[in-house]
Amino acid sequence: EIHGFGIRSIDDSKEGVERFIRRNPATSMVAVCDGKIVGAILCGHDGRRAGLYHVCVQENYRKHGIGQKLVERCLEALKSEKISKVNLIAFKQNEIGNRFWQSLGWKYCDNVNYYEYVLNEENITVFNP
């Protein structure tokens, strides 16, 4: 369980993740140690701009560069697909995640407003405490 992590009931279901990977087959990554997945990142683009989603590393595998390597691999894949800008959303309460992005030199954007319009009310977000 990842603390401060938001999971959507439909988008983040097995079927939702499979659909995302079918649309972006070369940009999402997993980290494997001793035959088990210890980290993962969903990464996709629309041909212009990319987004990173659900970057996570199991707690007992953190501080070993796994998250950083996952991000680097995704950025390399995006560059090879001629993508020049990547966005991500880190929830304010996800202190660990926000520190991670800052440590990698990602820029906090205070010049934009983030909006969303919900098309499916059943696709609810549940946060891990």
What is the predicted function of each stretch?
Residues 1-21:
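Conserved GNAT-fold acetyl-CoA-binding loop/helix
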Residues 32, 55-62, 90-91:
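A short, internal acetyl-CoA/4′-phosphopantetheine-binding micro-motif in the GNAT/acyltransferase core
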Residues 78-90:
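Conserved GNAT acetyl-CoA-binding A-motif
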Residues 30, 36-44, 51-54:
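Conserved beta-strand in the GNAT
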Residues 54-57, 63-76, 99, 103:
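Conserved acetyl-CoA-binding loop-helix of GNAT-fold acetyltransferases
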Residues 59, 88-97, 116-119:
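Conserved beta-strand-loop-alpha-helix junction that forms the acyl-donor binding cleft
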Residues 44-53, 62, 109-112:
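A conserved beta-turn-beta hairpin within the catalytic core of GNAT-like acetyltransferases
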Residues 18-30, 51:
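A short helix-loop-beta-strand connector motif used in the catalytic cores of GNAT acetyltransferases and
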